[in-house]
């Protein structure tokens, strides 16, 4: 239990660890965190729903149906929520369910209860958890914090929120799982310094580096893999067993479910014993822990590779890390503990049950948000996992909020029009680390119409990005002259590409140099074209301000610059642009003086009249 200095109980709060495999409930009661259990004293609730022609079965009752009714029994929905059908078919080619594309985004499950979405499935689980909590305390729950992986994207987070609303839960915050674990340990240990949270659950892996200082939890960086966890251990082990069975035919849904269940049982036993006797269909034998270690070693190394990349990215040496916290049921696997200990060169903390620590942190944070506790509130500074920006001329991405920026955050940048008399602006919102639009994730597009018709560069557009404490994004655009404004919340975007975030960051690092030079070259080309257009327009209006000799020189250098543009010769373009600016200096100076004189005469005329 985690003890808190709290004398007055004001409201009944709840922390929900919504897990891929299991979910947990916790609440602060009488100065301590209490983990809620069922009538059989089990604190783990399987995140499973069985849809039948009557009332859906949830949890342990639903788990009994996995083998008998795999098509209607939805497991690990957390891996599917907020995902497109293309992503799911690619990442999970063998699923026991019948699914189809949902026109509103995501997928639909075909069940005995009809078509249901991952949000519906999640809502049933959350509703069940809420009901069990009300029964446990015999009163209504006032507020709830739900935890999510740090690498859940905007669509996934929004889907969890919608599921909570559907379950009639008063959700006061979505809390990143690694941060939640740090809340639990931070309050218990009262430590200060750099802490790594290694979170390996059933379906996701996250690593977060946090700086703890006087009640402030600042997330310095996060990384992870949205599809790497204990479920993958089970899958690899089931394939290993399948080979031993020597079966020629492909397994059906029923056999596949049975095989996965057996693999999971063996995995759990191997966390305690060096060997396990197996009697499955036509095969009897022994599986040793060493065999299992060989099967899963590459996956564990993959998590450590992600850890290594994050430490390099935030320029942190292993020696400066004070503590390593282990979170998630999959960290019970002995090899995981051994490899993490070896990598970080220190024994990870496991004094709080890895299964329970996230729920404990959620309960503590929920209690503090509702101001039930008299102690100083902990300040959580989470970060955004990927940079956000908009498309600008040339197919570039202008980043407005950068990766690993603490949230909540609001940031504004000023832009202008690219063409004369432009009355419409299309804002294309993007997420990612690359320089070009084609290499980033498209989140949304929206249009601001009827802006003042003026010359290019005159109109001023303010673009504001906001990310709230739950990591949800909103974008506002304001045209300063007419005060026209438009704001959108990035929600269920059906064309959102659910790429693996670790892959995006890795690709941006590999291509950083090439992307930089490509952008510099393209920007120089755009600048050169822009200068040529401006100069041509100016000469049409005021060529009488200069001698024919000066005009000839300018025209000559214009031709040279145009040739450099056509040949896409960067260095020639750079040189010729500089020379054109030099020979045009006198003309532009005379033109500016003329315009200033005209402006003064007009003002004087206005005063006289």
Swiss-Prot record:
Domain of life: Bacteria
Keyword presence, Chaperone: yes
Gene Ontology biological process terms in this record: iron-sulfur cluster assembly
Any GO molecular function: ATP-dependent protein folding chaperone
Annotated keywords: ATP-binding, Chaperone, Nucleotide-binding
Keyword ATP-binding part of the UniProt annotation: yes
Job of this protein: Chaperone involved in the maturation of iron-sulfur cluster-containing proteins. Has a low intrinsic ATPase activity which is markedly stimulated by HscB. Involved in the maturation of IscU.
Family the entry assigns: Belongs to the heat shock protein 70 family.
Name recorded for this polypeptide: Chaperone protein HscA
Source taxonomy: Bacteria, Pseudomonadati, Pseudomonadota, Gammaproteobacteria, Enterobacterales
Gene: hscA
């Amino acid at each position: 239990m985690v003890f808190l200095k709290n004398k007055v109980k004001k409201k009944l709060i709840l922390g929900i660890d919504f897990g891929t495999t299991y979910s947990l409930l916790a609440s602060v009661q009488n100065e301590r965190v209490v983990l809620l259990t069922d009538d059989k004293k089990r604190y783990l609730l399987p995140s499973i729903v069985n849809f039948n022609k009557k009332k859906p079965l949830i949890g342990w009752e639903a788990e009994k149906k996995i083998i008998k009714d795999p098509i209607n029994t939805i497991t690990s929905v957390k891996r599917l929520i907020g995902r497109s059908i293309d992503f799911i078919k690619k990442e999970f080619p063998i699923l026991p369910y019948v699914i189809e594309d949902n026109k509103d985004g995501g997928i639909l499950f075909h069940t005995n209860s009809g078509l249901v979405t991952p949000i519906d499935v999640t809502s049933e689980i959350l509703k069940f958890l809420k009901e069990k909590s009300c029964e446990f305390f015999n009163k209504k729950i006032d507020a709830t914090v739900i935890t999510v992986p740090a690498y859940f994207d905007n669509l996934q987070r929004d889907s969890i929120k919608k599921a909570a609303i559907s379950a009639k839960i008063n959700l006061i915050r979505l809390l990143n799982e690694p941060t939640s674990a740090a809340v639990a340990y931070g309050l218990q240990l009262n430590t200060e310094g750099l802490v790594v949270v290694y979170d390996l659950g059933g379906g996701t892996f996250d690593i977060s580096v946090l700086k703890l200082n006087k009640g402030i939890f600042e997330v310095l960086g996060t990384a992870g893999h949205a599809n790497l966890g204990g479920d993958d251990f089970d899958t690899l082990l089931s394939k290993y067993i399948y080979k031993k069975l020597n079966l020629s035919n492909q397994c059906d849904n029923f056999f596949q479910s049975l095989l996965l269940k057996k693999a999971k049982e063996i995995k759990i036993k191997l966390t305690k014993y060096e060997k396990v006797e197996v009697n499955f269909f036509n095969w009897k034998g022994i599986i040793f822990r060493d065999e299992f270690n060989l099967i899963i070693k590459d996956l564990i190394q993959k998590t450590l590779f992600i850890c290594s990349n994050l430490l390099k990215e935030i320029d942190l040496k292993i020696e400066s890390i004070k503590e390593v916290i282990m979170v998630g049921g999959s960290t019970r696997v002995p090899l995981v503990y051994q490899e993490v200990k070896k990598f970080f060169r220190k024994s990870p903390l496991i004094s709080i049950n890895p299964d329970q620590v996230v729920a404990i942190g959620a309960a503590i944070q929920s209690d503090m948000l509702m101001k039930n506790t008299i102690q100083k509130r902990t300040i959580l500074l989470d970060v955004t996992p990927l940079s956000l920006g908009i498309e600008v001329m040339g197919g570039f991405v202008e980043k407005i909020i950068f990766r690993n920026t603490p949230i909540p955050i609001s940031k504004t940048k000023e832009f202008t029009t690219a063409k004369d008399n432009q009355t419409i602006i299309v804002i294309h919102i993007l997420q990612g680390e690359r320089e070009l639009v084609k290499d980033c994730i498209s989140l949304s597009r929206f249009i601001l119409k009827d802006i003042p018709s003026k010359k290019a560069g005159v109109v001023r557009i303010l673009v504001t990005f906001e990310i709230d404490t739950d990591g949800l994004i909103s974008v506002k655009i304001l045209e300063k002259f007419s005060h026209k404004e438009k704001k959108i919340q990035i929600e269920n975007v059906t064309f959102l590409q659910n790429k693996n975030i670790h892959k995006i960051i890795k690709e941006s690092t590999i291509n950083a140099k090439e992307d930089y030079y490509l952008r510099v070259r393209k920007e120089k080309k755009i600048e050169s074209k822009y200068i040529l257009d401006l100069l041509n327009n100016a000469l049409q209006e005021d060529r009488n301000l200069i001698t024919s000799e000066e005009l000839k020189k300018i025209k000559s250098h214009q031709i040279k610059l145009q040739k450099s543009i056509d040949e896409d010769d960067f260095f020639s373009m750079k040189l010729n642009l500089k020379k054109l600016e030099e020979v045009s200096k006198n003309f532009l100076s005379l033109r500016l003086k003329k315009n200033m004189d005209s402006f003064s005469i007009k003002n004087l005329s206005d005063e006289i009249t």
